[in-house]
Amino acid sequence: MAVISVKPRRREKILQEVKNSSVYQTVFDSGTTQMQIPKYENKPFKPPRRVGSNKYTQLKPTATAVTTAPISKAKVTVNLKRSISAGPTLNLAKKPNNLSSNENTRYFTIMYRKPTTKKHKTWSGDGYATLKASSDKLCFYNEAGKFLGSSMLPSDSDSLFETLFKAGSNEVQLDYELKENAEIRSAKEALSQNMGNPSPPTTSTTETVPSTKNDGGKYQMPLSQLFSLNTVKRFKSVTKQTNEHMTTVPKTSQNSKAKKYYPVFDVNKIDNPIVMNKNAAAEVDVIVDPLLGKFLRPHQREGVKFMYDCLMGLARPTIENPDIDCTTKSLVLENDSDISGCLLADDMGLGKTLMSITLIWTLIRQTPFASKVSCSQSGIPLTGLCKKILVVCPVTLIGNWKREFGKWLNLSRIGVLTLSSRNSPDMDKMAVRNFLKVQRTYQVLIIGYEKLLSVSEELEKNKHLIDMLVCDEGHRLKNGASKILNTLKSLDIRRKLLLTGTPIQNDLNEFFTIIDFINPGILGSFASFKRRFIIPITRARDTANRYNEELLEKGEERSKEMIEITKRFILRRTNAILEKYLPPKTDIILFCKPYSQQILAFKDILQGARLDFGQLTFSSSLGLITLLKKVCNSPGLVGSDPYYKSHIKDTQSQDSYSRSLNSGKLKVLMTLLEGIRKGTKEKVVVVSNYTQTLDIIENLMNMAGMSHCRLDGSIPAKQRDSIVTSFNRNPAIFGFLLSAKSGGVGLNLVGASRLILFDNDWNPSVDLQAMSRIHRDGQKKPCFIYRLVTTGCIDEKILQRQLMKNSLSQKFLGDSEMRNKESSNDDLFNKEDLKDLFSVHTDTKSNTHDLICSCDGLGEEIEYPETNQQQNTVELRKRSTTTWTSALDLQKKMNEAATNDDAKKSQYIRQCLVHYKHIDPARQDELFDEVITDSFTELKDSITFAFVKPGEICLREQ
């Protein structure tokens, strides 16, 4: 029991001090003043235990007893006769802030957040944790070195990284332990930044009592200190208190100028970094996350930087040497107020999706204007320029987009929302509403073009929250009257990115619609655009004005002017740059001999149609063209054709060919499929533009016992992704039947290395999209592309038109390798060509080869000499502009013009077939493909001619 000896005259003063103390109480009973103090029992000391911990913190005394001493004027001696057992000690020092390098200290990385009841929790920040060998306490710091709190180790050491620790007002979890010297050094540097700042006090911190130990082991202290409250003073911050969040940058101009900002990534610690360009107002560099940057190829690095410049409204830089890599340097550029969107028109397979994801991730995490967002204490922006991004794409690509986000970023880093096909309309609207209003859960919404219309009302209400729009397969927006396009316009999203492989073929009206959506007003109104560009360019391309020098020069001038405007925000590269990254690809065009039933069907249809070539136009003859294309595939498709039923149903020979399923192309197809199945271990994709044709092919494959799957317009959207995945992963599936128009866009079918294009489409982009399904990133095997064409029929005319139709697209989208002024100025197939379109050449091995070459087809690559075609054309122009011409001279000029046109067509087709070998199977039995060569005996009578463009290596096994 502790006894206090006090003189009588000081009793009242002491009692007054005791009365004011919260530790002791003064009780007055029966008019007698008596002080009662706690009684100390002589038993082992039991230290306090933290809730949730099984470890005790014990006190180690410096003396076992305190004896009584006379009280001086300023001091009082306390004799606490208490026996304290020896044992583990409690460290009563302040929170650990000693961050010096200690070999016995372990370092960890951590993730922390505020406690939340959300279903999908996210971490708000990263930091470090330290653990000294002599301590059981983890100390937590944020990435700037600020102390967050501490927590005791769990009893089970195996659950160290699964335990959710409580540190101050945060939940903390260990990520991994730092082992590398460089990592430990970086952690020490980060923690040493705040060494001078005292750690925040906690309720468990106790103030130590200063004492002087005399010979008797006594503690002497002031009397007032003995009975006063033992409290901790509130920590007074050295910074001025504000009502704003401590990490928010002060908004006063004076503080903003004094604040120094730093990029999210240190450019000095990244190998070959990608540093974005900026304007003069930028406060910090934007550097592409090395997590993605290390996977980007050179053309993709340039693409990401180009798109960033466009969306940030930066003018195009002047690059003196395009071969020099400028992606590692940040250029200060002028602002371009006309531009806020970009059209990425790269060929299929160049990685447009990866480039887009890289741009999205960069804008979500970083911004060049750090003073406008919340920053850490060290001046690093905590949020990016964009918070909500809308991705609109065909429904077949929704799953692919989400997989790509997961592949490159991991969905734990970025929140990606897709609307389930099982949702009701109300559920979709609620999901979109929550996406826009809840900030941290999702950053990207991927939605199909059709679904966009059903949730347009919710998007319209909160359109100010959408920071960026991405439209995949953006050429779908070329129709100005489209509801989808008008819905997207109503959202008024400033930053827009359109992705497409073929944005334009031969229609400047569609081109204007797309460009005006990306950057509104950059081409003026449609009326002014039509007056300044469409009319002059169209007149220059009209064959009736081909010799009018004035019109041609004006058209060329307007074309150059348009190119100068659009190249500021359009990027177009061909897939030729992929040759060094992908396996070799062999292109084979096979001309298949038509069956006699097909020839009979052609004659009956053309006679029954009673064509008037004087009034014939392409639009009016479209039904007949479709019917003739079906005959090329199989005569059995004729009976169900609408045009045939309404115009030619009374022909005498209808039954002789309408019941026949055989055709030259079907014979070659089934022989190829059998050769691929028996001679290789590869898979094959068969593409057609008609589901009826796919039905016939599917029946033939079933009869041959060939396992396959099919994707066309009748397949529900929710099943398409699983069909593609099953084909790519299941080795038991041999074939994939694909509808070019319904499923040929954006699909990744790298499980197959051979593709057969059974029929052609007027639009070359449809066929190019379909053929690029297998030769793309992820393909490991050499690829073979087969195009089947019926000899001498409409199939060949379509092929010839396809070879030339890209001229306008190449001109305005910058395919420099194929750019040719003459090819861009002329429509190679005018109305007169329709007459030839409906003719059947039965006496030729290949009408296309007859147009361009007279070789013997021995498999040699033909070198074409440069022609004087342009000079001849200019001469004809000059001669045609004279004031008067006789009838004889006029007839002569017309004949020369016709000859000149034929020569031009031949020249352009030759240019498109450069590097192709010309093979006549009757003279040469090596077609540079083991499957065709091994099946040559069966195919010799079915293949009349072939164009082959071999890959880099010969796959023929010796």
From Swiss-Prot:
CDD domains assigned: DEXHc_RAD54 (cd18004), SF2_C_SNF (cd18793)
Annotated Low complexity bias: 202-212
Residue ranges of every copy of the Helicase C-terminal domain listed in the record: 665-824
EC number of this enzyme: 3.6.4.12
Chain ranges of the Helicase ATP-binding domain: 333-521
PROSITE patterns: HELICASE_ATP_BIND_1, HELICASE_CTER
Main location (coarse class): nucleus
Gene Ontology terms, MF aspect: ATP binding; ATP hydrolysis activity; ATP-dependent activity, acting on DNA; DNA translocase activity; double-stranded DNA binding; helicase activity
Compartment(s) of residence: Nucleus
Sequence segments annotated as region (Disordered): 189-217
SUPFAM superfamilies with a match to the protein in the record: P-loop containing nucleoside triphosphate hydrolases
Top-level class of the enzyme under EC nomenclature: hydrolase
Cross-link (Glycyl lysine isopeptide (Lys-Gly) (interchain with G-Cter in ubiquitin)): 649
GO cellular component: nucleus
InterPro entries assigned: Helicase_ATP-bd (IPR014001), Helicase_C-like (IPR001650), P-loop_NTPase (IPR027417), SNF2-like_sf (IPR038718), SNF2/RAD54-like_C (IPR049730), SNF2_N (IPR000330), SNF2_RAD54_helicase_repair (IPR050496)
Gene3D superfamilies recorded: P-loop containing nucleotide triphosphate hydrolases, SWI2/SNF2 ATPases, N-terminal domain, Tandem AAA-ATPase domain
A Gene Ontology biological process term: heteroduplex formation
Reactions accelerated catalytically: ATP + H2O = ADP + phosphate + H(+)
Annotated residues for binding of ATP: 380-387
Keywords: ATP-binding, DNA damage, DNA recombination, DNA repair, DNA-binding, Helicase, Hydrolase, Isopeptide bond, Meiosis, Nucleotide-binding, Nucleus, Ubl conjugation
Motif range (DEGH box): 506-509
Function description: Involved in the recombinational repair of double-strand breaks (DSB) in DNA during mitosis and meiosis. Has DNA dependent ATPase activity. Promotes D-loop (displacement loop) formation with RAD51 recombinase. Modifies the topology of double-stranded DNA during the D-loop reaction to facilitate the invasion of the homologous duplex molecule by the initiating single-stranded DNA substrate. Required for adaptation from G2/M checkpoint arrest induced by a double strand break, by participating in monitoring the extent of single-stranded DNA produced by resection of DNA ends.
Other comments on record: Present with 1270 molecules/cell in log phase SD medium.
Quaternary structure, from the entry: Interacts with RAD51 and DMC1.
Family: Belongs to the SNF2/RAD54 helicase family.
Protein name in UniProt: DNA repair and recombination protein RDH54
Protein's gene: RDH54
